[in-house]
Amino acid sequence: MHPQQLVVSWFSLVLLASPIVAIWELEKNVYVVELDWYPNAPGETVVLTCDTPEEDGITWTSDQSSEVLGSGKTLTIQVKEFGDAGQYTCHKGGEVLSRSLLLLHKKEDGIWSTDILKDQKEPKAKSFLKCEAKDYSGHFTCSWLTAISTNLKFSVKSSRGSSDPRGVTCGAASLSAEKVSMDHREYNKYTVECQEGSACPAAEESLPIEVVMEAVHKLKYENYTSSFFIRDIIKPDPPKNLQLRPLKNSRQVEVSWEYPDTWSTPHSYFSLTFCVQVQGKNKREKKLFTDQTSAKVTCHKDANIRVQARDRYYSSFWSEWASVSCS
């Protein structure tokens, strides 16, 4: 047999669909059926083929029904709704021969569903994935929000452009202990850490990082994408080691700080600029901006001095505030 025929025959043992573009393999024995979602939609015809050399005595069942769905090596089903998805199993004489799990990916009015994640609306509308980098090392963190707490599975893949999918490695998604309140509702926060393997911090980026997150809730499949340059998601850690030094014969103090440990080096090349503000109980003083790591301010009783940082030469996001008490 010709090698190409072998490949086609092997695939036909697993699953056939018409049209073939409407169904694809997510992982071994798990398939996504793409459906146009509207009233009286015809759905997709899916032909399941039992992965066995056996020919006779085969029956089919589904976890959605207690009845025998059919007999023979193949089973043809019409997938229109979630009740038609789920796990299909072929048996012979009480023995399980193979299983196939069908998930649904909905498209309404030409738009793929985004029901699983919450739109964070930052830095723009339809921002389901929020990615940040603390420096230019190629390491970044992406997070997302969901109101769903059970039957969830996430998988994240990333690359620099679409030419080399091995260029960026992402770990497993983890549930944060932090709950996020938005629109009068609490959401679970998930994060994932990614690292570009051959990152050069000083090099100009020509291709963006591409991130694809696949989400499965019960029998629903969705995917979310984000594309960015590392320079556009930079958010430094706050300055560290804030210190106050009283000035002689003056109501002012000198506040000093250091670059965060996580920031790229050398600092002479990767420079930060800083914002300093005195925050009292009832008001906030005017902000002071400096490229130095110290500043002179008037420190009122019961006030705090706070400092934040961002990239000096590229308008990155400002860091969170670091603060020290005046008292």
Swiss-Prot record:
- The glycosylation sites annotated in the UniProt record are 223
Keywords on this record? Cytokine, Disulfide bond, Glycoprotein, Immunoglobulin domain, Secreted, Signal
Q: What GO molecular function annotation could you give as one example from this UniProt entry?
A: interleukin-12 alpha subunit binding
One GO BP: type II interferon production
CDD domains cross-referenced by the UniProt entry: FN3 (cd00063)
Q: Does the keyword Aminoacyl-tRNA synthetase apply?
A: no
Question: In what residue span(s) does the Fibronectin type-III domain sit?
Answer: 238-327
Is-annotated flag, keyword Signal?
yes
Compartments annotated for it: namely: Secreted
State the PROSITE patterns in the record. Answer: FN3, HEMATOPO_REC_L_F3, IG_LIKE
Q: Which GO terms describe its cellular component?
A: extracellular space; interleukin-12 complex; membrane
According to the UniProt record, which cysteines are disulfide-bonded? 50-90
A Pfam cross-reference name: IL12p40_C
Q: Which family does it belong to?
A: Belongs to the IL-12B family.
Q: What is this protein called?
A: Interleukin-12 subunit beta
Query: Where does this protein come from, organism-wise?
Result: Ovis aries
Q: Which gene encodes it?
A: IL12B
